[in-house]
Protein backbone atom coordinates (compact mmCIF):
# COMPACT_ATOMS: atom_id res chain seq x y z
CA UNK A 1 0.00 0.00 0.00
CA UNK A 2 1.40 3.36 -1.05
CA UNK A 3 1.73 6.24 1.39
CA UNK A 4 2.04 8.75 -1.47
CA UNK A 5 -0.46 11.60 -1.21
CA UNK A 6 -2.01 12.76 -4.47
CA UNK A 7 -3.63 16.09 -5.33
CA UNK A 8 -5.39 17.25 -8.46
CA UNK A 9 -7.20 20.21 -9.94
CA UNK A 10 -10.64 20.77 -11.45
CA UNK A 11 -9.55 19.39 -14.84
CA UNK A 12 -8.83 15.98 -13.32
CA UNK A 13 -12.01 16.13 -11.22
CA UNK A 14 -14.04 16.70 -14.40
CA UNK A 15 -12.66 13.45 -15.84
CA UNK A 16 -13.75 11.49 -12.76
CA UNK A 17 -17.12 12.96 -11.74
CA UNK A 18 -20.12 13.29 -14.06
CA UNK A 19 -21.34 16.39 -12.19
CA UNK A 20 -21.22 19.79 -13.87
CA UNK A 21 -22.24 23.35 -12.97
CA UNK A 22 -24.26 24.12 -10.92
CA UNK A 23 -24.02 20.84 -8.97
CA UNK A 24 -20.27 20.15 -9.14
CA UNK A 25 -19.23 20.99 -5.58
CA UNK A 26 -15.54 20.03 -5.41
CA UNK A 27 -13.02 22.53 -6.79
CA UNK A 28 -9.74 20.82 -5.93
CA UNK A 29 -8.36 17.73 -4.24
CA UNK A 30 -5.72 18.86 -1.77
CA UNK A 31 -4.67 15.37 -0.65
CA UNK A 32 -5.77 11.89 -1.58
CA UNK A 33 -4.24 8.91 0.14
CA UNK A 34 -5.51 5.79 -1.65
CA UNK A 35 -7.23 3.25 0.61
CA UNK A 36 -7.50 5.85 3.39
CA UNK A 37 -8.70 9.41 2.99
CA UNK A 38 -9.26 12.48 0.85
CA UNK A 39 -9.08 16.18 1.66
CA UNK A 40 -10.82 18.38 -0.91
CA UNK A 41 -11.83 22.02 -1.26
CA UNK A 42 -15.01 23.86 -2.21
CA UNK A 43 -14.67 27.64 -2.56
CA UNK A 44 -18.05 29.08 -1.62
CA UNK A 45 -18.83 32.25 -3.60
CA UNK A 46 -21.78 34.63 -3.53
CA UNK A 47 -22.35 33.75 -7.21
CA UNK A 48 -23.63 30.26 -6.36
CA UNK A 49 -27.16 29.93 -7.79
CA UNK A 50 -28.65 28.59 -4.53
CA UNK A 51 -27.85 31.84 -2.70
CA UNK A 52 -30.53 33.64 -4.74
CA UNK A 53 -33.20 32.02 -2.59
CA UNK A 54 -31.30 30.67 0.44
CA UNK A 55 -31.39 33.37 1.84
CA UNK A 56 -31.47 36.70 -0.04
CA UNK A 57 -30.69 38.85 3.03
CA UNK A 58 -28.23 36.42 4.66
CA UNK A 59 -26.90 33.83 2.18
CA UNK A 60 -26.28 30.42 3.76
CA UNK A 61 -25.16 27.27 1.91
CA UNK A 62 -27.90 24.63 2.25
CA UNK A 63 -26.89 21.74 4.48
CA UNK A 64 -27.93 19.19 1.87
CA UNK A 65 -25.40 20.72 -0.53
CA UNK A 66 -22.65 20.47 2.08
CA UNK A 67 -23.51 16.77 2.35
CA UNK A 68 -23.52 16.51 -1.47
CA UNK A 69 -20.04 18.10 -1.57
CA UNK A 70 -18.85 15.49 0.95
CA UNK A 71 -20.47 12.73 -1.15
CA UNK A 72 -18.65 13.97 -4.26
CA UNK A 73 -15.35 13.90 -2.35
CA UNK A 74 -16.22 10.35 -1.24
CA UNK A 75 -16.87 9.44 -4.89
CA UNK A 76 -13.38 10.68 -5.79
CA UNK A 77 -11.90 8.53 -3.02
CA UNK A 78 -13.99 5.57 -4.20
CA UNK A 79 -12.64 6.08 -7.72
CA UNK A 80 -9.11 5.79 -6.33
CA UNK A 81 -10.16 2.63 -4.46
CA UNK A 82 -12.24 0.88 -7.13
CA UNK A 83 -10.16 1.90 -10.18
CA UNK A 84 -12.96 1.14 -12.65
CA UNK A 85 -12.03 -0.23 -16.09
CA UNK A 86 -14.21 2.37 -17.85
CA UNK A 87 -14.13 5.56 -15.73
CA UNK A 88 -16.18 7.61 -18.21
CA UNK A 89 -19.01 5.06 -17.96
CA UNK A 90 -18.88 4.74 -14.15
CA UNK A 91 -21.33 6.38 -11.76
CA UNK A 92 -21.23 6.63 -7.98
CA UNK A 93 -24.66 6.37 -6.40
CA UNK A 94 -25.17 7.93 -2.99
CA UNK A 95 -27.15 5.21 -1.19
CA UNK A 96 -27.22 6.21 2.46
CA UNK A 97 -26.46 8.70 5.17
CA UNK A 98 -26.31 8.23 8.93
CA UNK A 99 -25.71 10.56 11.85
CA UNK A 100 -25.72 13.80 9.85
CA UNK A 101 -25.13 16.89 11.98
CA UNK A 102 -24.81 20.56 11.07
CA UNK A 103 -22.67 22.60 13.46
CA UNK A 104 -22.21 26.04 11.83
CA UNK A 105 -23.39 28.00 8.81
CA UNK A 106 -21.35 28.15 5.61
CA UNK A 107 -21.45 31.56 3.92
CA UNK A 108 -20.09 33.21 0.78
CA UNK A 109 -16.33 33.68 1.07
CA UNK A 110 -15.83 30.52 3.12
CA UNK A 111 -13.48 27.76 2.04
CA UNK A 112 -15.18 24.47 2.77
CA UNK A 113 -12.62 21.74 3.50
CA UNK A 114 -14.04 18.29 2.81
CA UNK A 115 -12.40 15.48 4.82
CA UNK A 116 -13.55 11.96 3.99
CA UNK A 117 -12.10 8.78 5.49
CA UNK A 118 -12.72 5.28 4.13
CA UNK A 119 -14.22 3.00 6.80
CA UNK A 120 -15.20 -0.23 5.05
CA UNK A 121 -16.46 -2.00 1.94
CA UNK A 122 -19.13 -4.67 2.34
CA UNK A 123 -21.27 -6.32 -0.39
CA UNK A 124 -20.84 -3.54 -2.92
CA UNK A 125 -21.35 -0.67 -0.46
CA UNK A 126 -18.57 1.77 0.43
CA UNK A 127 -18.86 3.47 3.83
CA UNK A 128 -17.12 6.71 4.80
CA UNK A 129 -16.81 9.12 7.72
CA UNK A 130 -17.16 12.66 6.35
CA UNK A 131 -16.47 16.03 7.98
CA UNK A 132 -16.78 19.48 6.39
CA UNK A 133 -14.83 22.30 8.04
CA UNK A 134 -14.48 26.06 7.71
CA UNK A 135 -11.48 27.71 9.36
CA UNK A 136 -10.72 24.51 11.26
CA UNK A 137 -14.22 24.32 12.78
CA UNK A 138 -16.69 21.55 11.95
CA UNK A 139 -19.56 22.78 9.78
CA UNK A 140 -21.15 19.38 9.11
CA UNK A 141 -20.43 15.69 9.60
CA UNK A 142 -22.02 12.42 8.56
CA UNK A 143 -21.46 8.78 7.70
CA UNK A 144 -21.96 8.29 3.96
CA UNK A 145 -22.55 5.20 1.86
CA UNK A 146 -22.26 4.77 -1.90
CA UNK A 147 -22.12 2.10 -4.56
CA UNK A 148 -20.44 2.01 -7.95
CA UNK A 149 -22.28 1.05 -11.17
CA UNK A 150 -21.76 1.45 -14.87
CA UNK A 151 -23.90 4.19 -16.41
CA UNK A 152 -25.88 1.69 -18.50
CA UNK A 153 -26.69 -0.56 -15.51
CA UNK A 154 -29.91 -0.05 -13.59
CA UNK A 155 -29.34 1.70 -10.21
From Swiss-Prot:
Subcellular location: Cytoplasm
Entry keyword Hydrolase: no
One BP term from GO: lipid A biosynthetic process
Pfam families named in the record: FabA (PF07977)
EC number of this enzyme: 4.2.1.59
Any GO molecular function: (3R)-hydroxyacyl-[acyl-carrier-protein] dehydratase activity
InterPro entries according to UniProt: FabA_FabZ, FabZ, HotDog_dom_sf
Signal peptide boundaries: none
Keywords: Cytoplasm, Lipid A biosynthesis, Lipid biosynthesis, Lipid metabolism, Lyase
Catalytic activity reported: a (3R)-hydroxyacyl-[ACP] = a (2E)-enoyl-[ACP] + H2O
PANTHER family: 3-HYDROXYACYL-[ACYL-CARRIER-PROTEIN] DEHYDRATASE
Family named by the database record: Belongs to the thioester dehydratase family. FabZ subfamily.
NCBIfam families assigned to the protein according to its UniProt record, in alphabetical order: fabZ, PRK00006.1
Role, per record: Involved in unsaturated fatty acids biosynthesis. Catalyzes the dehydration of short chain beta-hydroxyacyl-ACPs and long chain saturated and unsaturated beta-hydroxyacyl-ACPs.
Annotated protein name in UniProt: 3-hydroxyacyl-[acyl-carrier-protein] dehydratase FabZ
Organism annotation: Burkholderia mallei (strain ATCC 23344)
Amino acid sequence: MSTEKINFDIHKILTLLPHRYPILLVDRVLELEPHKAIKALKNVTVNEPFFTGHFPKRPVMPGVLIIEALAQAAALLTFAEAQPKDPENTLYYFVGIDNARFKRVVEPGDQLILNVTFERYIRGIWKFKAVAEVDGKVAAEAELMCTVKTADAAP
